[in-house]
Amino acid sequence: MRRIITLIIILTNYISIANAQNNWYEKYLSCVNDSDVHALKTMIEQWEQAEPESPDVYAAWYNYYIKLAMTDVVALTTTAPEDNQEALQLMDSTGVVAGYMYGIESYNDSILQIGYQKLNTAIKLFPDRLDLPFGKVAMLFRQQLYSEVMQEFRNVLDRSKKNGNRWLWTLNQPLDDGEYILKDSMQDYFVQLYDAGQSDYASQLVEWMLQLYPTDIIFRANKASLLAIAKRYSEALPIYLSIYEDNPDDIIVASNIAHIYYTLGDKEATLKYYSKLLQCGDSEIEGLAKQRMKEAKSW
């Protein structure tokens, strides 16, 4: 009976602690997007006094300093902003566009570094909290600090080998499928790196992932795609063929194989793989396959 009573007390205390953590986090969420940074600071200070060892307090401080460091600056230039950002066009007396005015983000680096120090401490103390390094990566991407992004990825992947992808998230909630979350996140980051023109870093990330998951189709396809884009067809083709062998229903892979053979001028292989796409269910790919087969037959 004493053991049962003790267990009930422990569970009750645990539930009370969990509820307290949730309450503080909810209070934080209610004011984090408010423009009043002083109120946010006061709230985090109170939270820290109540839960000084909480990784979420460290994360809250990080977000506070990021918020404090960011300012919007008005840019006046003769070139249009990138990434389809909205801008006010300035016309000259003849009605011709003479310039553009738009807002850009600016950061106070000294304040930003305080935020990074807070988060670095949290990452060191709580290495299984995956949201912490990913939160840092988000800001590093915005600053275009890609070498530092890659270092965070390396640290995360090294940790994954130690913890078996048993990751935690906000409020120390365990992730149900840590391996899937890791892979899916790294795939998103791969796309971000490539879209940012960082193909070398994108390639490095793929190599790291394949060292851990050599049979993963998505990262094998990423590697083959990067090689094909670089016109290194002799290296890309065997990878695509091995993926196709594992997953013959992948019409994108089949299309890439057919395209490489078409580019290399291999008539027999071009006809073979494009013929597999004539009834793939994608009208655009089917149309291209018919056109390419017609061309190949005339070689």
What is each model feature region?
Residues 60-61, 135, 188, 222, ...:
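Canonical tetratricopeptide repeat
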Residues 67, 142, 195, 229-230, ...:
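Register position in tetratricopeptide repeats
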Residues 52-53, 127-128, 161, 214, ...:
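Short coil turns that delineate tetratricopeptide repeat
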Residues 174-246:
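Alpha-helical adaptor scaffolds
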Residues 64-121, 125, 142, 147, ...:
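Short coil/linker segments at helix-helix boundaries
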Residues 189-214, 271-299:
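Terminal, low-structured helical/coil segments at or just beyond the last alpha-helical repeat
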